[in-house]
Amino acid sequence: MSFSLFRKAPKFWERRGPTSLLLWPLSWLYGLILRARKLIHDLGIVRTKPTPVPIIIVGNIRVGGTGKTPIVIALAKRLSQLGWKPGIISRGYGSSSQTAPLLVRSDSSPSLVGDEPVLIAKRTDNQFPIWVYPKRQQSIQALLKHSPEVDVIISDDGLQHRGLTRWPAREGGRDIEFVVRDSRGEGNRFLLPAGPLREPATRDRDATLFTGNPSFNEKKTGILDEYFLGRRAFSLGTYLGRPYQLIDHANTQSLEQIAEQFLPKSMTAIAGLGNPQRFFDDLAKQGVTCKQIPLPDHAQYTPEFFAKVKAQCLLITEKDAVKCAEISDERIWVVPMSLHLPENFVEWLQSILQRPDPHRYTL
């Protein structure tokens, strides 16, 4: 369950103030609904069928993007190197209405299946089966029927999807729930709509995955250390790759070359992400300073939009690039982002996935 009251994250989500306190009664009601849904699930009132293979859920408790998709890509590639046969499911955010699960390929339409699934297919060269549908359990059924060799499923988001049956590792199972957390943290720690949280910050998880540095507030107050004391957490290093031209992927330049070639005032960075500032900050760390145009997540692009941007060089994300296949503008350069999984994380992940199926030993 989520709210779409705000096109982009309001500032009062970051710190408690008059507006967030005024909206707090609605957040309390939202929390009550969450607890009721959890109770129904825990009591087994709604029957769900266990999945025959382990499930890795890469989700977040804060609305908006926190960097889940690069993690899904990195997980699939690393697990494949280790001998696993991953499959991927996604809701397909930003997609048009669907009546049945759909198989995603690198040439699928983002408007039909969503931005992230197409990006995953492109970055993995269609190596893994990817299925999208809001009802994730049906996606799993379609995936396993189409690709019975799959022995582990990665879900891009889905923490709040109660219909996605799981037996988490922390309870002795072999399914894994990851909460991805970026530099914004939990903001004012209120639930929607007074704050940015889909679920309480204290939500159980098997591990927290950090994709950014702690916010200034957390460094100053020490809340971060107190909250994560005794919890399993991993810091995942992210880095920007070598940009390539949108109309000619073989034409590449380093960010340093681009920064030397164009003056800052003649360059513009554009990002339609849940947290576009992260892209801009990553560029700045590489010495690229330019004008910034932040857009809402899943923003749509047209030739007319880019024509209005007066710049000699336009830098966009790979997620945005999948929606620009029909655009021919030599000024546009795509900046890929990759992610490194530390070995201690991979070893822990392996130890969980290799557990025996707990469903076989229950009466």
From Swiss-Prot:
Nucleus found in the keyword field: no
Disulfide bonds: none
Any GO molecular function: ATP binding
Enzyme class, UniProt record, top EC level: transferase
Pathway: Glycolipid biosynthesis; lipid IV(A) biosynthesis; lipid IV(A) from (3R)-3-hydroxytetradecanoyl-[acyl-carrier-protein] and UDP-N-acetyl-alpha-D-glucosamine: step 6/6
GO biological processes: lipid A biosynthetic process; lipopolysaccharide core region biosynthetic process
Gene Ontology CC annotations of this record: plasma membrane
Entry's transmembrane regions: none
Catalytic activity: a lipid A disaccharide + ATP = a lipid IVA + ADP + H(+)
Binding annotation for ATP: R62, V63, G64, G65, T66, G67, K68, T69
EC number: 2.7.1.130
Source taxon at top rank: Bacteria
Keywords recorded for this protein, A-Z: ATP-binding, Kinase, Lipid A biosynthesis, Lipid biosynthesis, Lipid metabolism, Nucleotide-binding, Transferase
Pfam families in the cross-refs: LpxK
Keyword ATP-binding listed: yes
PANTHER family: TETRAACYLDISACCHARIDE 4'-KINASE, TETRAACYLDISACCHARIDE 4'-KINASE, MITOCHONDRIAL-RELATED
Role played: Transfers the gamma-phosphate of ATP to the 4'-position of a tetraacyldisaccharide 1-phosphate intermediate (termed DS-1-P) to form tetraacyldisaccharide 1,4'-bis-phosphate (lipid IVA).
Record-stated family: Belongs to the LpxK family.
Protein name, entry field: Tetraacyldisaccharide 4'-kinase
Gene name for this UniProt entry: lpxK
